[in-house]
Amino acid sequence: MNTSNQHKAGHVTTRKLLDMKQQGEKISVLTAYDYTMARILDRAGIDVILVGDSASNVFSGHATTLPITIEEMIYHAKAVVRGVHDESGRAMVVVDMPFMSYQISGDEALRNAGKIMKEHGCDALKLEGGKIIADTVKRITDVGIPVMGHLGLMPQSIYKYGSYKVRAQEEQEAEQLLQDARLLEEAGAFAVVLEKIPSALAAEVTLMLTIPTIGIGAGSHCDGQVLVVNDILGLNREFHPRFVRQYANLNNVIDRAVQQYVDDVKQGGFPADDESY
């Protein structure tokens, strides 16, 4: 395993994230899927980079996260780990275990977790689910692999839900989420993502757990926040969910740049003499 990025001074660890929660310092998380973006995020001071199975959507154009494979996740993870290592090496890198790589059996989950960790040298893995995967989380953490949980809206279960609406609005589902959060912490998870749940419920979970909560569409009371980097940069002009704050409009910037390049090439304005050998 390539662990050279983990040995750089100031590298964010699971212990560091726990300290941040205890000290009231918010945790910043963004997704990345390639070397260049990983370098930019690490240089900008992001705490955690999530190599999300959302690559299935934003990188490969699938409608859901379900089609992405272990091999594809390893490909993206290797690129991100190299990017962090070649920059400051500060950011923690967490990788999603893709759909059906951990749900079939505990033994298969353990083999796949080991395969993902060994092939790219990331810091931790993320799994979706509560009670149903708690034993799997324990088995993985027991062999020394850190696990981040994920509750609320779980994109790998989208066909079960039928929509991407807010979860745990009813009392029964909210109580189950609270129980699942406790079980994940007891199983050894070092943090848990809370996706698209009521802000008040996220605040309750955050207060209840000793491990950090990372929100996405879960209000401001979580210990940290995660978003898809393509969304905050405005790269997808059709996607504007309520929980995303767009910090740039790179879709328009790129569009104008490409149009200018096309015009320059067509009109013979590129390359100029000082751009030639």
Swiss-Prot record:
Query: What EC number(s) has UniProt assigned to this enzyme?
Result: 2.1.2.11
Return the broad EC class: transferase
Q: Which residues bind Mg(2+)?
A: 53, 96, 128
> Entry cofactor note text?
Binds 1 Mg(2+) ion per subunit.
The entry's localization annotation reads:
Cytoplasm
Query: What are the recorded GO MF terms, alphabetically?
Result: 3-methyl-2-oxobutanoate hydroxymethyltransferase activity; magnesium ion binding
- Catalytic activity, per the record? 3-methyl-2-oxobutanoate + (6R)-5,10-methylene-5,6,7,8-tetrahydrofolate + H2O = 2-dehydropantoate + (6S)-5,6,7,8-tetrahydrofolate
Which terms in the GO cellular component ontology are assigned?
A: cytoplasm
Q: Does the record's keyword annotation contain Metal-binding?
A: yes
Give the protein's cofactors.
Mg(2+)
Q: Transmembrane segments in this chain: where?
A: none
Q: Which domain of life is it from?
A: Bacteria
Function of the protein: Catalyzes the reversible reaction in which hydroxymethyl group from 5,10-methylenetetrahydrofolate is transferred onto alpha-ketoisovalerate to form ketopantoate.
Describe, as the record does, how this protein assembles with itself and its partners: Homodecamer; pentamer of dimers.
Which family does this protein fall into? Belongs to the PanB family.
The identity of this protein, by name, is 3-methyl-2-oxobutanoate hydroxymethyltransferase
Q: Which organism is it from?
A: Chlorobium phaeobacteroides (strain DSM 266 / SMG 266 / 2430)
